[in-house]
Every structure is written in C-alpha cells, then in structure tokens.
C-alpha cells in the first residue's frame, strides 16, 4: 500500500490496508465543512451524550490534580478504581468480580482491540453483529482473523437469532462479539436469547466479548449479561466504561472484566502501548461509581423523553418506519419506503435538509435500507430536524 508524499511514496505495512474507520467522524467532518460555508446543520450523527459531566466528578478530577495524581500508574489501573469497578459491576450483574479481573484502559476501544490481539490468531473466526459497530470488523481484519457476520433483523426487534449464530460456528471459531444494548439499532438482547446462547456454548472452547457500554441506558426491563449464566463468566470479557453512562466521552476512561490470567495479558498490551490510563481521570472514575448516581438517572430519563419525540416524529414522515428502541440513544428507522439507498438518503438529508445522520451501511452491508439517528441532542433540535426531514420528504418523495 503506497501513499504519494510529494515526489516520494510512503510505503506502509500491508496490515494498514485492512484497517477500517468509523463513518460518524467522516460525516461530522463533512457537516463541519458545510457549517464553515454558512449552512446550519443539526447533528444527529455522533453517539455522544450532550450533557455536562456531573459536578462531583469534575471536582474529584480537579482535586486529584491538586493532590498530585499526575504521574504514571499501574498498567492495569489504580487499585482503588479496580475495586470500585469490581463492586459496581458485580452488584449490577449479580456476579462476583475480583479487582484482579479488572483492567482499566483509556476508553473502551482498547478492550476490543486487546481482546482480539490476545485471543485471535491468523485464520481464527470471530462472529460479530451486522449491522454493528464498524470497529469490530476493522479490528478482526487487522489481525488477519476471519470476520463472520451474523444478522440483526428488524422482524426480531434486532435481537440475536441464536440458531443463526450457532449455525455459523466451526472448529475455527475463537470469539463471539455481543453488543447489548446495541449500536446502531438500540436493540436489547432478551434474557431468553442470552440464556440459549450460554447453554449452547457451555461445552465449546469459545470466548465471548460482551460489549455492555450502554448497559445503564435501558428503558424497558433490565440489563442481562451473559456472565450471569453458568460457565460463562470465565469465558467472557465484559467491555464497559464511563463515556455513555456519565457523559465522559472526552475523559477516555473504560475497562474490561475478564479472567485474571487474561487480564494479565491485556495489562501487558497496555504496558506496550499506552503505558497506563491517566491517574486523575481514574480518581474521577471512583467518584463517578461511588458518588451520587442521580446524574445517571437524569440522563436516562431525558434520553427516554427524546426517544419518544424522535420515534413519533419519524413515523409521521412518508417513507419512514421507526421501531421503538429499548436501549442506548439511537433509532434505526427503515427507509425502504423512500425508494432511496441508505447512503443516498443520508447524503441528501445532510446536503439539502441540513440534518446529519448515518447510513445504515456505515454499520455493515446488512444495514442497507436503514438510517441511524442519535438522539443525543436537545428536544428542540430533534424537533427542528424532524421538521426539516419531513419537509424534504414531502418535496422529494
């Protein structure tokens, strides 16, 4: 793979040709370019809570800086944060978590990457959801693994079809990636589906990466983790963090929970890459988990209100059908009635209506026929976006 640089060419490692990207940031760049030219754009493309971080968390970080928490820390994370995570995660999932099973990382993505680096050899198969978070496939391909998608379908409320997943297992299957609540659909895996999958995997040497970053943003029912079922905790890596729950995306604070011997290997990868996670942000993480939780409740209830507004609004627009998502802060409307491809419609809404959203195909080929909107924006802006989309649809459809 070569890239022109002046009169010379940069010769990159072949693996770089296998590295993907995340379309949300590409759309954000295009939207910013339109704004720079004077066009008003409503941003419903980025999955980032628009709330400020709670004051007690900010103050904990500020005090940590004043107290000198500005130096290297342990690669696996500060003991006090690992203890707080173990207590919180164990209580919320009704499982026992030891601090030795926790690795703290700068954001949740290193847990995805390090899990795949540590477990997947060339040619090993990894099952992942499609549509799904695009970085899953990117990381699988980067390490020369075989990316094997399983479908999430609207007629199943975007729950996992366990029979389909089991039908894709082979002797080469090393890892299954689950994501619930799910990005981009907002779907939530049912207890029955998780239980059936756990039972089927009981006698197989297969790990599960369970991406539970939205686990506290569920609007009906409760979060269920596959680690709650017999025999699964020791073969599951939980990915979680602070970005979505506590509106701390820019703090870069995530963690993984896994068996201690694997945690030691992931900590080695931290040593060889990031060294450690910033200490003062970890002190803030302790305050987030052990302090007042009303900020989380307020964020969830505001998202619930916005969800109602955007679902009702989209269902009034010709050509759109929007099911009610049960978690996260995304809607994934079916746009087959518009007779437009997902990419073409997303481009038109950005360029002509001034509404930034993502094509369903940004999350895999099986996202065709859908768009993803993030309702991590004010009700006022969501309503304005809906008015623009409806006006565009009535002019063009």
How does the language model describe each region?
Residues 16:
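Substrate/cofactor-recognition hotspot
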Residues 72-105:
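Conserved N-terminal alpha-helix of the aminotransferase class I/II PLP-enzyme fold
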């Amino acid at each position: 793979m070569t890239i022109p640089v002046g009169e010379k060419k940069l010769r990159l490692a072949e693996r770089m040709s296998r590295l993907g990207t995340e379309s949300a940031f590409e759309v954000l760049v295009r939207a910013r370019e339109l704004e720079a030219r004077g066009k008003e754009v409503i941003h419903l493309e980025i999955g980032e809570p628009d709330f400020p971080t709670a004051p007690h968390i900010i103050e904990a970080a500020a005090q940590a800086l004043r107290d000198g928490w500005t130096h290297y820390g342990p690669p696996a994370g500060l003991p006090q944060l690992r203890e707080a995570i173990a207590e919180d995660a164990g209580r919320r999932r009704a499982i026992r978590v030891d601090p030795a099973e926790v690795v703290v990382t700068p954001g949740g993505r290193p847990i995805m990457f390090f899990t795949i680096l540590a477990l997947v050899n060339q040619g090993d198969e990894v099952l992942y959801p499609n549509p799904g978070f695009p970085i899953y496939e990117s990381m699988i391909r980067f390490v020369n693994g075989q990316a094997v998608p399983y479908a999430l379908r609207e007629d199943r409320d975007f729950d996992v079809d366990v029979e389909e997943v089991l039908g894709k297992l082979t002797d080469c299957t090393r890892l299954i990636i689950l994501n619930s609540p799910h990005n981009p659909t907002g779907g939530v895996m049912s207890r029955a589906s998780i239980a059936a999958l756990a039972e089927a995997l009981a006698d197989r040497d297969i790990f599960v990466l369970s991406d539970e970053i939205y686990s506290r943003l569920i609007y009906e029912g409760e979060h269920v983790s596959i680690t709650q079922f017999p025999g699964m905790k020791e073969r599951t890596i939980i990915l979680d963090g602070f970005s979505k729950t506590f509106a701390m995306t820019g703090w870069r604070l995530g963690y993984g929970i896994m068996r201690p011997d694997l945690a030691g290997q992931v900590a080695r990868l931290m040593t060889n890459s990031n060294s450690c996670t910033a200490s003062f942000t970890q002190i803030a993480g302790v305050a987030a988990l052990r302090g007042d939780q009303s900020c989380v409740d307020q964020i969830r209830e505001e998202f619930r209100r916005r969800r109602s507004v955007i679902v009702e609004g989209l269902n009034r627009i010709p050509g759109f059908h929007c099911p009610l998502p049960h978690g996260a802060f995304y809607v994934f409307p079916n746009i087959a009635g518009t007779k437009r491809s997902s990419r073409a419609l997303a481009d038109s809404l950005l360029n002509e209506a001034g509404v930034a959203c993502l094509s369903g195909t940004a999350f895999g080929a099986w996202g065709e026929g859908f768009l993803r909107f993030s309702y991590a924006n004010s009700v006022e802006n969501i309503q304005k976006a809906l008015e623009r989309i409806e006006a565009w649809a009535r002019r063009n459809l």
